Amino acid sequence: MTCGSGNGSSEQELKAIVRDLGCGPYFLGTFDKRFPGFMAPDKLACAIVNTAGRETGGEHWLAFGWNPRYNTCYLFDPFGFSDERLKQIYQFEYEGLLRRSALATKDRCITLEKSTQSVQGPRSAACGLFCCMFLHAFVHWPDRPMDGNPTMKLVTGVSNSMLQSPQVQPTLRRNQEVLYRFLNTHSSYFRSHRARIERATAFDRMDMQ
């Protein structure tokens, strides 16, 4: 799977980068929209999930993290779409995996913390790479992975309602440049395949059809 029409990051690439970032012991893998949720409620865990079925080739990557200390599930969407927009654009809903995760806990109650700002440009194909960056923050600072940590402070979020605005495109482009520098520093796999990865995930990749 990738993030649509063969663009973006493959599952193999994401797994290799996530390992380089130190997420390996907690990383459950890459999944399509049928991700079952977190079935071991006492263990810190994370995953990268596509909004589409595997049979489609993929559409958009999201990252999930489970912090057992607070029974909290983190959902990171590089676009920061609302639940309604995720359903409208990708036909993706995550209530089922939350319900299954909750049933695995003792009190059957969990908290969802979801990203609401955009860090990725609207025509960018780097969603999978942004998910890797978030998971680095999650495994190193599981109590504050969305912000307030050295990794996610590197990028600047903008209101999702401004995603298409020319005014914020320079900020979103800078985010992607920062993302590439971050991965170049922390991932040997990225360094070895940088040219190909940057070409496949370019800021304007979705215009190159």
Swiss-Prot record:
Cellular component terms per the entry's GO annotation: host cell nucleus; virion component
Keyword tRNA-binding applies: no
Catalytic activity reported: Cleaves proteins of the adenovirus and its host cell at two consensus sites: -Yaa-Xaa-Gly-Gly-|-Xaa- and -Yaa-Xaa-Gly-Xaa-|-Gly- (in which Yaa is Met, Ile or Leu, and Xaa is any amino acid)
Alphabetized SUPFAM superfamilies for the sequence: Cysteine proteinases
Any single Pfam family the record assigns to this protein: Peptidase_C5
Keyword annotations: Autocatalytic cleavage, Disulfide bond, DNA-binding, Host nucleus, Hydrolase, Late protein, Protease, Thiol protease, Virion
Activity control, per UniProt: Requires DNA and protease cofactor for maximal activation. Inside nascent virions, becomes partially activated by binding to the viral DNA, allowing it to cleave the cofactor that binds to the protease and fully activates it. Actin, like the viral protease cofactor, seems to act as a cofactor in the cleavage of cytokeratin 18 and of actin itself.
Presence of keyword Hydrolase: yes
Upregulating conditions: Expressed in the late phase of the viral replicative cycle.
Function: Cleaves viral precursor proteins (pTP, pIIIa, pVI, pVII, pVIII, and pX) inside newly assembled particles giving rise to mature virions. Protease complexed to its cofactor slides along the viral DNA to specifically locate and cleave the viral precursors. Mature virions have a weakened organization compared to the unmature virions, thereby facilitating subsequent uncoating. Without maturation, the particle lacks infectivity and is unable to uncoat. Late in adenovirus infection, in the cytoplasm, may participate in the cytoskeleton destruction. Cleaves host cell cytoskeletal keratins K7 and K18.
Protein name per the record: Protease
Source species: Human adenovirus B serotype 3 (HAdV-3)
Name of the gene: L3
